[in-house]
Amino acid sequence: KKYGGWDNRKLVGFFERYCKVLFERYKDQVKYWMTFNEINNTLKLPYLAAGMVVADDANAPQRQYQAAHNMFVANALAVKSCHEMIPGAKIGCMLSLSTAYPNTCRPEDVMETYQLRQRSLFFSDVMLRGRYPSYIDRKWEELGVQVQMEPGDFELIAQNTNDYLAFSYYMTSTHIAGMKIRSNTGGHIGADNPYLEKSKWGWPIDPVGLRFVCNELYDRYQKPMFIAENGLGTADTIDSDGRIRDTARMEYLKKHIEALQQAVADGCDIFGYTWWGPIDIVSAGTGEMEKRYGFIYVDKDNQGNGTLRRRKKDSFEYYKKVIASNGQDLELPAED
């Protein structure tokens, strides 16, 4: 209420001070750092990504892009402090980078889908390349955006780029030129893709898309990559014997790790993978408990009723095996 979110430049100084406290306190224990989570959601989910309540009006882009610039400056200051205070540490940025395919080979579909992708990659372009991309000038002119910058901002951003790129990947979408752009926490909600299966909540399941994104990003930035979020939100059933046979979740995990192995074979530098998430929580995308991601079941329903008792799903032991083998043993358990 007092500062209004990241469109207020004062937050840059607050963030720098906060980072320095963390670097000093944990410099002997932590060598990998990440500045912002899914920072590119500032343009589609500003409250979640940038702490801003933004009215859906003509002034929204001005506030959102101003917030983005302030976050770029804050990120660069964090990178600078991290490298000075913790020699050898790596500090990265994190984006939501589920991608979109053109619905057809119609040139308008292809061009508009490309521009939609630029909208997401704008953030990593600045934070990893150290400069504003040329395509943003036209976008700002069309939107009437005039970002306020201070002397030295460009130099600071150019001299303090991130060491690695982390990103979340859940699905792909399909875009038709002229369609209204809608988004959720997983990415762009587009047209139907008849070649892909979908989750109960309509999210396309596309492991090949993960391989595609890894190659796209590594070609663009040549920086190490970390898949910080990947997972399947679905309903779970407790069988009469007390087991939760979440086969669909295990199949999703297996196919996406296989896609990562293919990306590594393609030459991509991928140093980490984490699943969203280990335990059932309320879904950020829909506000439901029923939409479960975890390997651990929590007894709670959409109305908040339940004992909160926890129990392992079949996927718990499966992922434990996958971790122990560093992804080499992906054989699914036999059905009984």
Language-model features: locations:
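Active-site region of glycoside hydrolase catalytic domains
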Residues: K1-D336
